[in-house]
């Protein structure tokens, strides 16, 4: 009888030990799944952030490039001769003064 009790207790202990290892294994696999989900979420957010930074960088680069092109275009335009502009302004001023003296000015 004593041997039977010992074997029963030993079998019960083995059963409880087996149950605990299976139970802990399931918990650890659930924990591993949660960790994997968290890692995936962090990686996805990181990729999204990298993509947003890349798009912003490309936009800034294209904006600067277009600004540079506009400045170059303005500098490449032919400049007016200052003497010609001054002589034109003087001629128009003289013309208006004469028209004012005659009373035929369209402005005054």
Swiss-Prot record:
Protein name (record): Uncharacterized protein C1393.12
A cellular-component GO term for this protein: cytoplasm
Species assigned in the record: Schizosaccharomyces pombe (strain 972 / ATCC 24843)
Disordered: region residues: 89-108
Keyword Phosphoprotein attached: yes
Subcellular location, record wording: Cytoplasm
Lineage: Eukaryota, Fungi, Dikarya, Ascomycota, Taphrinomycotina
Phosphothreonine: residues carrying this PTM: 56
Highest taxon, organism lineage: Eukaryota
Major localization listed first in the record, in broad terms: cytoplasm
Annotated keywords: Cytoplasm, Phosphoprotein
């Amino acid at each position: 009888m004593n041997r039977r009790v010992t074997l029963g207790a030993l079998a019960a202990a083995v059963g409880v030990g087996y149950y605990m290892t299976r139970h802990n294994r399931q918990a650890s696999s659930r924990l591993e799944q949660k960790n994997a989900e968290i890692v995936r979420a962090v990686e996805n957010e990181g990729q999204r952030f990298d993509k947003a930074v890349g798009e912003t960088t490309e936009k800034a680069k294209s904006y600067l490039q277009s600004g540079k092109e506009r400045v170059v275009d303005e500098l490449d335009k032919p400049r007016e001769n200052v003497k010609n502009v001054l002589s034109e302004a003087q001629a128009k001023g003289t013309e208006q003064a004469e028209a004012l003296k005659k009373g035929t000015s369209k402005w005054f």
